[in-house]
């Protein structure tokens, strides 16, 4: 069977919009009746998802699978790096954790990893009409080019057409695009089919002279200028998209009742599972904000301690900022606190590391629970949209459990290892109703019909609508169906 076309969405920088544009293209092609699959050879993210067979992939690829109408699969993200302390990361290959690696270890094995990624992409191309690939970081990191896995290394191995996305909202986009084009090799440059300007605000006619000059300098046409899309906040891939002070979602607009709920999510330095926080923001009348100060912990109706890749280190950070005392006072006053993953572990009485250098630290002592951190990674898909990914095991539990025999509950304190639990609509409504009661907000009402899944699809449709309006997707399909080495000839421009 002939392989279907595939192409690569690369970006001049991290957070240029690659993940969102890839998701939007997947959605647009799926709506057009094409069998489309997402692909990211290598992802570096702590915001992961667990597949139905217990594998682990980047959360962005799970979202892109939803855009395609597919279940998440390890095929869509065969290599995942989960950054940890001391410049090391947990390496996940085809959904299974392989252990910790340092930068030198990873670079030495990148040739093998590139082969794994290329073979997986080829398998997808044989089964789908089109595969939309997402690059990683910047393709212009020439110091890493020899062993590149996710950008031009993959594009050369699979002969992919490449589109470079630049974020105009942060400034300097023309220099970013020109510099990326200039610094890479002639062989890689030949694969570039076009530039894409993302997050544009203002009058496009003011930008046009710059685009004309950019094409004169590079020989590459700007295929699309994508406007800034307000209120797109789905499945952040990394903490760059969750800065302190940022309000998540629509900001509690249109409450059904007479009162709102304010949620403060502590912005841990090494946090993961940001989608857990985002799930609450779909509810009318709920405002969710990332915070790192004592005042916000005092003043909010609910405080969330999210997941983290380094429970002990982030607990020390939390103490350094005085947040431990604020959380303890909240608990004494009966004000709601929710800990998820590593955040739940912090709420324990003690946390013991059973690794090579055993040690023990005091937790926040909000629960009569003792946690042991072990080398073994626990991954469980509960089949209801919730899942567990953690190294902590409960050695002692003296509390009422919270969710089907898991987690802990004491009055207004909630803790669980389950990520994604609040994406379940009835579960989220029950939880917020309890929070409102404990917070003294009887005038807050949950919506009977808000759907987290539906909101995400609506957001994906919004992105797809914008892409269809500002990028000729029929032309894009025609371009990527041609041989990659035909790029940037007069006939293809």
Swiss-Prot record:
Gene Ontology molecular-function annotations: ABC-type vitamin B12 transporter activity; catalytic activity
One Pfam family cited in the UniProt record for this chain: GATase_3
GO biological process: cobalamin biosynthetic process
Coiled-coil portions: none
Keyword flag Nuclease: no
Family statement drawn from the similarity comment of this UniProt entry: Belongs to the CobB/CobQ family. CobQ subfamily.
Protein name: Cobyric acid synthase
Originating species: Corynebacterium efficiens (strain DSM 44549 / YS-314 / AJ 12310 / JCM 11189 / NBRC 100395)
């Amino acid at each position: 069977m002939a392989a279907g076309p595939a192409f690569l969405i690369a970006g001049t920088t991290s957070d240029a919009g690659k993940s969102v544009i890839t998701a939007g293209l997947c959605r647009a092609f799926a709506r057009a009746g094409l069998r489309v699959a997402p692909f990211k050879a290598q992802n570096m993210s702590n915001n992961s998802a667990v597949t139905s067979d217990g594998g682990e992939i980047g959360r962005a690829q799970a979202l892109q699978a939803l855009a395609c109408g597919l279940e998440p699969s390890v095929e869509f993200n065969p290599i995942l790096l989960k950054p940890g302390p001391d410049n090391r990361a947990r390496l996940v290959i085809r959904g299974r954790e392989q252990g910790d690696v340092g930068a030198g270890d990873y670079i030495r094995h990148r040739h093998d990893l590139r082969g794994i990624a290329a073979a997986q992409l080829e398998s997808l191309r044989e089964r789908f009409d089109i595969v939309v690939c997402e690059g990683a970081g910047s393709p212009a990191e020439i110091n890493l080019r020899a062993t590149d896995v996710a950008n031009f290394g993959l594009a050369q191995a699979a002969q992919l057409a490449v589109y470079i996305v630049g974020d105009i909202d942060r400034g300097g986009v023309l220099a970013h695009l020109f510099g990326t084009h200039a610094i890479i090799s002639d062989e890689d440059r030949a694969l570039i089919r076009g530039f894409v300007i993302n997050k544009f605000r203002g009058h496009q006619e003011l930008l046009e002279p710059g685009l004309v000059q950019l094409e004169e300098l590079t020989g590459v046409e700007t295929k699309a200028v994508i406007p800034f899309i307000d209120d797109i906040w789905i499945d952040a891939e990394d903490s760059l998209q969750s800065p302190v002070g940022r309000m998540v979602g629509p900001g509690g607009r249109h409450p059904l009742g007479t009162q709102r709920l304010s949620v403060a999510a502590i912005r841990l330095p090494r946090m993961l599972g940001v989608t857990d926080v985002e799930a609450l923001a779909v509810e009318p009348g709920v405002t969710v904000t990332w915070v790192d100060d004592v005042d916000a912990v005092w003043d909010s109706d609910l405080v969330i301690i999210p997941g983290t890749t380094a429970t002990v280190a982030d607990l020390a950070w939390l103490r350094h900022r005085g947040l431990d005392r604020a959380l303890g006072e909240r608990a004494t006053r009966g004000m709601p606190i929710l800990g998820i993953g590593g955040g739940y572990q912090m709420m324990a009485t003690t946390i013991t590391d059973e690794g090579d250098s055993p040690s023990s630290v005091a937790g926040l002592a909000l629960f009569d629970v003792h946690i042991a951190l072990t080398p073994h990674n626990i991954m469980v898909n509960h089949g209801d949209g919730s899942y567990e990914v953690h190294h902590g095991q409960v050695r002692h539990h003296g509390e009422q459990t919270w969710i089907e025999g898991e987690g802990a509950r004491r009055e207004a304190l909630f803790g669980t290892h389950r990520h994604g639990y609040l994406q379940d609509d009835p579960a989220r409504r029950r939880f917020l109703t309890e929070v409102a009661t404990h917070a003294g907000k009887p005038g807050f009402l949950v919506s009977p019909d808000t759907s987290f899944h539906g909101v995400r699809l609506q957001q994906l449709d919004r992105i797809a609508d914008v892409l269809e309006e500002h990028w000729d997707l029929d032309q894009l399909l025609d371009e990527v169906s041609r041989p990659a080495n035909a790029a940037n000839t007069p006939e293809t421009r």
